[in-house]
From Swiss-Prot:
Function: Acts in an adapter protein-like fashion to mediate the interaction between the kinase PRKCZ and its substrate VAMP2 and increases the PRKCZ-dependent phosphorylation of VAMP2. Positively regulates adipocyte differentiation, by facilitating the phosphorylation and thus inactivation of the anti-adipogenetic transcription factor FOXO1 by the kinase AKT1. Plays a role in endosomal control of AKT2 signaling; required for insulin-stimulated AKT2 phosphorylation and glucose uptake and insulin-stimulated phosphorylation of AKT2 substrates. Participates in transferrin receptor endocytosis.
PANTHER family, alphabetized: LD41958P, WD REPEAT AND FYVE DOMAIN-CONTAINING PROTEIN 2
Gene behind the chain: Wdfy2
InterPro entries: G-protein_beta_WD-40_rep (IPR020472), WD40/YVTN_repeat-like_dom_sf (IPR015943), WD40_repeat_CS (IPR019775), WD40_repeat_dom_sf (IPR036322), WD40_rpt (IPR001680), WDFY1/WDFY2 (IPR042234), Znf_FYVE (IPR000306), Znf_FYVE-rel (IPR017455)
Zinc finger feature spans (FYVE-type): 281-352
Single GO molecular function: zinc ion binding
Identification of the protein by name: WD repeat and FYVE domain-containing protein 2
BP GO annotations: positive regulation of fat cell differentiation; positive regulation of protein phosphorylation
Length: 400
């Protein structure tokens, strides 16, 4: 008797289009060339490469250029084909690429930092080159004259840099976990505010100028969405990685956030839902459910002749509870907890199946990601890994 085979439900996942291999060291940054089947990469092996797809279907370098120092970061402007490369020795080197992407012409060098350049950003509208370095300096230069316009000393080494052209606000995330917002003028800057939300260093920043929302990724494995435009101080946590978050990209047309981590995970978050802030954890000397004393509350332990318990916290209500009153686990996707977390028994009963419906999808890139670039027009994602490989993905099955 033949058994009926039930068709498997189709799982929507990114489609691997191409592996681009050949770098001797880690590719620190790379971008997809718009309107071309090409990739520009800068690597720790000191090379700048422009990879174009050949008739064979493989990507081969049309440009292979050796720099005097390892390449730490880059910024590419498609309109002018201007490529700004940050180097380990503190220099930013600028090139113009030819229309056919077969030649790069040196333009100028900026002696921007005393040590490794960590981030570089070319702003076409203002003709500015913004950068951060391991010397804890943020600097901006005029790309026309090459002159340094100003600088600001950050509290720690910066690892995230974003700029809003309309307001001239610059966002700097650093290794201490702090995010700093500066207002830039032509030759001076004003500190507007700084804030912290991560328990680890900030590893990535992403700015959405339409919703006026800043996303920060951290070595504490979390992503935080900061509502800058709302002016209410709202911060939404997203917990979906098992290792440090290395890169962020936002798809404005679908309101989806792509976060990638050292765990190889590509997480696509639906940001078109009404998310909730996680509550502050409350302090108490005894369980706020059963009133059992916690182990440091000697007086109540002595008076009630009870052994002190360890304190836990419910992730939904924030109350201090004992292990017995928080024995259950649940995901709370609208609070950013896509994995199961500790909740008190009463909150567990109150959470509905609708509230447990996931708001993110999880995918495995099969390499530890150090950098990503998203091409929204084609729906392609580039990931660069510690395995020295660049991968190109078609994200349209999951970003739509």
């Amino acid at each position: 008797m033949a058994a009926e085979i039930q068709p498997q439900p189709l799982t929507r996942k990114p489609i691997l289009l191409q592996r681009v291999e050949g770098s001797q060291e880690v590719v620190n940054m790379a971008v997809i060339v718009p309107k071309e089947e090409g990739v520009i990469s800068v690597s720790e092996d000191r090379t700048v490469r422009v990879w174009l797809k050949r008739d064979s279907g493989q990507y081969w370098p049309s440009i292979y250029h050796a720099m005097p120092s390892p390449c730490s970061c880059m910024s590419f402007n498609p309109e002018t084909r201007r490529l700004s490369i940050g180097l380990d020795n503190g220099t930013i080197s600028e090139f113009i690429l030819s229309e056919d992407y077969n030649k790069m012409t040196p333009v100028k060098n900026y002696q921007a930092h005393q040590s490794r350049v960590t981030m570089v950003l070319f702003v076409l509208e203002l003709e500015w080159v913004l950068s951060t370095g391991q010397d804890k300096q943020f600097a901006w230069h005029c790309s026309e004259s090459g002159q340094r316009l100003g600088g600001y000393r950050t509290s720690a080494v910066a690892s995230g840099l974003q700029f809003d052209v309309e307001t001239r606000h610059v966002f700097i995330g650093d290794h201490s976990g702090q995010v700093t917002i500066l207002k830039l003028e032509q030759e001076n800057c004003t500190l507007l505010t700084s804030f912290r939300g991560h328990t680890g260093g900030v590893t990535a920043l992403c700015w959405d100028p339409v919703q006026r929302v800043l996303f920060s990724g951290s070595s504490d494995h979390s992503v935080i969405m900061w509502d800058i435009g709302g002016r209410k101080g709202t911060a939404i946590e997203l917990q979906g990685h098992n290792d440090k978050v290395q890169a962020l990209s936002y798809a404005q047309h679908t309101r989806q956030l792509i976060s990638c981590g050292g765990d190889g995970g590509i997480v696509v978050w639906n940001m078109d839902v009404e998310r909730q802030e996680t509550p502050e954890w409350l302090d108490s000397d005894s369980c706020q459910k059963c009133d059992q004393p916690f182990f440091w509350n000697f007086k109540q332990m002595w008076d009630s002749k009870k052994i002190g318990l360890r304190q836990h916290h419910c992730r939904k209500c924030g109350k201090a509870v004992c292990g017995k009153c928080s024995s259950k686990r649940s995901s709370i996707p609208l609070m950013g907890f896509e994995f199961e977390v500790r909740v008190c028994d009463s909150c567990h009963e109150a959470i509905t199946d609708e509230e447990r419906a996931p708001t993110a999808t999880f995918h495995d890139s099969k390499h530890n990601i150090v950098h990503v670039h998203f091409d929204a027009t084609r729906g392609w994602l580039l990931t660069s890994g510690t395995d020295k490989v660049i991968k190109l993905w078609d994200m349209t099955p999951v970003v739509s």
